[in-house]
Each structure stands twice: as structure tokens, then as C-alpha cells.
């Protein structure tokens, strides 16, 4: 599958083109599904934060707006990785920014360490985020492989 990449993105400025961002939003919608009655998750996987007064009675438009806002924050957190900002943003939307970047006693992930060294062979590290409670979950593994195929720019 080939993508036409905007010139700012191709030049490595870390800007995610709208067409690719929209594709990521649609992918997450399909993968997450609609969360109703599964608090603290609402809409398309938004985790309620302390102080947020949202309820699970969101409209699809509100949930879409919330997803876009959350994904934009995730992509912005990885802006220094330029072409990989969207790929890392999509992953961090699901696993959390600090699981990748590290924080306090939590070390940086192998994926981030490899990218910081300039290594581009990251498929194995990306797909390694496929476990839940220490067990490999086949559906999560399929999702990671699909994300990598769609959003990795060599």
C-alpha cells in the first residue's frame, strides 16, 4: 500500500498530514470499537481523566472529536521522531505515552531506544506491544501488524 506524503512530512518536520491522520483515526475507530458501559473508557477508547465530567452518553461526533484530540496529543509527544510521530502516536493511544518514553523508574522502551540510535528495523519491537497481563493476545498482535503496515514510513 503506497501513500502520498506531504512535503513537510517528507522533509522530516514531524507534521502529520491530514490525510494520514484521518486514516489513523478511522483505523482506531475500527480497532477500538464503541465503548459504552465500560467506564472509565468512553467513545472510541478515551480514558476519563480526573476532573473530566464526560459521560458515556457521547454522540459519535463528540467521540470523534475526543479521539482526534487525544491522538493529536499522542503524536505531538513524539514530534522529535519526525516521520515516526504518527506510528508512535497510534501505539501510545493504546498503550500510553509513558510505556514508550519512560518516566521515573520506568525505562524507555526498546522501540524508542532503537529509534533514538537511528535504527529503522523496528517491526519486532513495535509488534512486541501485543501482550495483556503477560500473555500474547492474537487480536492485539494482528492490530500491531496492521498499524505497522499502514503507518510505518521507511
What feature does the model see in each segment?
Residues 6-38, 46-53, 58-77, 97-154:
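Long, amphipathic alpha-helical surface segments
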Amino acid at each position: 500500500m503506497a501513500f502520498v506524503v506531504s512535503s513537510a512530512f517528507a522533509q522530516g518536520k514531524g507534521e502529520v498530514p491530514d490525510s494520514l491522520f484521518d486514516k489513523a483515526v478511522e483505523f482506531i475507530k475500527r480497532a477500538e470499537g464503541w465503548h459504552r458501559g465500560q467506564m472509565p473508557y468512553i467513545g472510541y477508547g478515551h480514558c476519563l481523566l480526573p476532573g473530566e465530567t464526560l459521560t458515556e452518553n457521547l454522540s459519535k461526533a463528540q467521540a470523534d472529536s475526543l479521539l482526534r484530540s487525544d491522538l493529536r496529543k499522542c503524536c505531538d509527544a513524539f514530534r522529535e521522531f519526525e516521520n515516526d510521530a504518527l506510528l508512535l502516536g497510534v501505539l501510545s493511544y493504546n498503550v500510553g505515552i509513558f510505556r514508550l518514553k519512560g518516566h521515573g523508574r520506568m525505562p524507555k522502551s526498546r522501540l524508542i531506544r532503537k529509534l533514538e540510535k537511528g535504527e529503522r528495523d523496528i517491526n519486532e519491537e513495535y509488534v512486541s506491544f501485543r501482550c495483556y497481563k503477560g500473555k500474547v493476545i492474537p487480536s492485539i498482535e494482528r492490530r500491531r501488524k496492521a498499524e505497522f503496515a499502514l503507518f510505518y514510513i521507511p
